[in-house]
Amino acid sequence: RVKEDIFDIQDEIVKKITIALIGGIEISSLKRAHRKPTENMTSYEFLLKGKDNHHKFTKEANEEAIKNLDLAISADANNAQAYAWKACVMGQAFYRGFTEMTDEKMGELLTLLEKALEVDPNDFECHRMQAEVYLSMHDFEKSKASGQKATNMNPNDPRVISIYGEALIRLNELDKGLLYLQKAYELDPIPQGQTTGDRRLASLFLAHYLKNDLDKCNEIKDKIINIDNRTWLLCIDLYNSCSKEYKEENWYKEGLNEFKDLDWSLEVDRYHLNNQ
């Protein structure tokens, strides 16, 4: 048993080092890309700039990311990830209200994903992106299918197993989904573009909320630095269902003030919950 534990620990160390190395390689390549004139940049470097701008989460950076990815595609029409990331950037623009989501725009987004997988059907990143987009469209079965394909190809990428876990919990496969969400949190608690582990923790909170586990939800809530409106609202619902008092709690008072002007119908739609 001790030997098995040692091998498990070694596996975890290797996984975390691999994640760090890949991230380090991308950062080094991105720094070189920033020093190059545009006319000398490769498709891969344009792709990295697009990904970097995507993770800045502003309207201006989103628009710049689209330009970067268009240039990546122009430089190499067989860069599958450039198509997939452009679809992701468009999805971000819809989600954050940077641009209006029309049938035409959604058609373009889906065409980009189809093109990405046509170019390289074995690119796990493309399947991951497809899972993300299907989740945002509330097509949870397709999100699960794409997430499973990506996970089969790369079971140790926290972004991959995270979206797979998100799809699973929305299909009421709670225990299985929790395993993947917990593993993603352990491998990479602070995702790229984030400064805290709040996003991963919010996903775990949702899973335990769906299991109606107040104690575990409270444990996770106390680890979150800035509670998002979904976690806040679901926490209220869970307290109510358990007949627990909460109106004197700091988290409730702070959220009441912070979220008072939100368009709740829009926000709840962004939770991508399964109404069934």
What are these regions (language model features)?
Residues 30-36, 129-132, 269-270:
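Short linear capping/connector segments at secondary-structure termini
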Residues 109-113, 126, 134, 142-276:
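Alpha-helical protein-protein interaction modules
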Residues 51-59, 87-99, 137-138, 171-172, ...:
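Short coil/turn linking the two alpha-helices of tandem helical-hairpin repeats
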Residues 61-78, 104-120, 147:
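Amphipathic alpha-helices of TPR/Sel1-like and other helical repeat/solenoid scaffolds
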Residues 34-36, 74-81, 114-124, 186-197:
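Flexible helix-coil transition and linker loops at the boundaries of alpha-helical arrays
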Residues 1-64, 68:
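Catalytic-center loop of serine/cysteine hydrolases
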